[in-house]
């Protein structure tokens, strides 16, 4: 198991952003802040996310790495497939982040945010793996794989 290379509070960017969102794990051992608007919001239905999160799908929001700041504790990570790292709280196991060698952003689990009222997914990906009981909002962009 590794610890994440995410920015720590002491390395917080000096530029103030108009928008800040905070969140953390279930037990409160890990806290984070996202400065600025998310780069994307979407639902992933892939089997890896289903198994890692323990749900039918996960809603991710993206942030530039320099705008994602761990303000308390440390996010532990494990490499779940080559070049893919999932971040979680070492104490309670809450899933928090997803990073990949081929990804420029940090993906954060939307459900770990303190306030989710601004979250509006734009797409569904990996619909070829969706669970049969999940009803899909056809108003969102829908893809069987990643676009």
Where are these regions (language model features)?
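A short Gly-Trp-Pro
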Residues: 2-147
């Amino acid at each position: 198991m590794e610890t994440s290379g995410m920015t720590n509070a002491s390395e917080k960017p000096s530029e103030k952003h108009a928008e800040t969102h905070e969140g953390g794990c279930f037990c409160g051992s890990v806290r984070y802040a996202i400065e600025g608007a998310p780069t994307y919001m979407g639902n992933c239905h892939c089997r890896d996310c289903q198994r890692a999160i323990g749900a039918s799908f996960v809603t991710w929001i993206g942030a530039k790495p320099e705008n994602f700041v761990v303000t308390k504790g440390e996010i532990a990570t494990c490499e779940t497939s080559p070049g893919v790292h999932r971040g979680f709280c070492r104490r309670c196991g809450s899933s928090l982040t997803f990073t990949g060698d081929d990804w420029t952003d940090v993906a954060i689990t939307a459900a770990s945010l303190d306030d989710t009222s601004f979250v509006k997914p734009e797409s569904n990906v990996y619909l070829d793996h969706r669970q049969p009981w999940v009803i899909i909002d056809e108003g969102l962009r829908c893809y069987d794989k990643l676009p």
